[in-house]
Amino acid sequence: MAKRETSYELWLREEGIPVIGGFGVEDVTELPLKPWKRTGGRGAYIDLKGMEGFTGMYVGEIPPGGALQPENHLYEELIYIIAGYGATEIWSPGDNGRRMHFEWQQGSLFAIPLNTRHRLINGSREPVFFLAVTSAPLMIDLLHNVPFVMSSEYKFSDRFDAESDYFVPTNTRKEVGGFINWETNFIADARGALVDPSEAKGYGVKITSFDMGGSTLVGHIAEWPVGRYHKAHFHQGGAILLILRSKGYTLMWPPEAGIRPYQSDHADQVVKVDWREGSVFSPPSGWFHQHFNTGNEKARQLAFRYSGQSGKYLLGAWRAINKEGVRTSVREGGTMIEYEDEDPQIRADFEAAINRVGVPGSAGSK
């Protein structure tokens, strides 16, 4: 029987630009972008196996010296600038007199507040490339009325009311649910932003969650040393991981393969995703996944996800399978595999990988 399409999937097809699938994309800057009538630029949608109708993603291009068409929509959106510099003009529906303007550059990350009118402007003589993650699948599938989603005049003044300092970078960080959470609507350069120690996930690992635009769509920035790797864990689908620095690989495997997939003769179920700067991938619901740095510099990853524990506004559906949390061992009811419990083949393969490229490292040990 042919698979039926959701309202969101039908909309993607009607948009007239490529839709890229699979477990991951090695370099989003190399995708085949096509002219995009609705936005006035070029673009491609990315709909990976692990996104599962929770999150949407696309890559957009703004022509040199040009701008995209103004738009507003009833879904949340986070934008990361891959290349170029420019500005965003933003205002509430029906409030043209109070337009705000803020500038961005390569590495900038910001939220588009819910249902605000906005326009992205290229300030350079080269194309601007950006990656956007949205909650469009949830909203379009629930309402199945795209014109309403894209043309509502409702003003969410609790999210945005043209505050003069709305997009001024802040460094407000608080511990929320055991995580350091950064409350800001704009990060000038996510590639160099300060991240906080989080060694429960691995030796030398640093992770800082961020909360933008009053959204349930949030994320975190993770960094870990040369020659090291994260502990494996799982969570709900929909999380999207973008590599900002270094190179390496990620292993992903389904829950039925167990915590030691090689020992239990399930090696054929382990998916390996090689990554470098510009790679993006998404682990499916309940799949263990583990990140390995084989490069000669600290790895840095930008994650987009819903707020299950760390953010101000939580999405219950996203934390449904997270049990006691991604930083708690499976032995204690969580979803994380401690180094001593992992499949020995995993460390052996990693040590062989870093030895082949001459990268010093100590794998998961101190």
Where are these regions (language model features)?
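A short, N-terminal "cap"/entry segment at the start of jelly-roll beta-barrel domains
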Residues: 1-53, 145-220, 336-366
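Conserved short histidine dyad/triad with adjacent acidic residue
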Residues: 38-45, 56-73, 220-236, 251-256, ...
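Conserved metal-binding segment of the jelly-roll/cupin
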Residues: 63-64, 102-125, 130-136, 272-295, ...
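A short beta-to-alpha transition loop/helix N-cap that caps and shapes the active-site region
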Residues: 138-144, 309-314
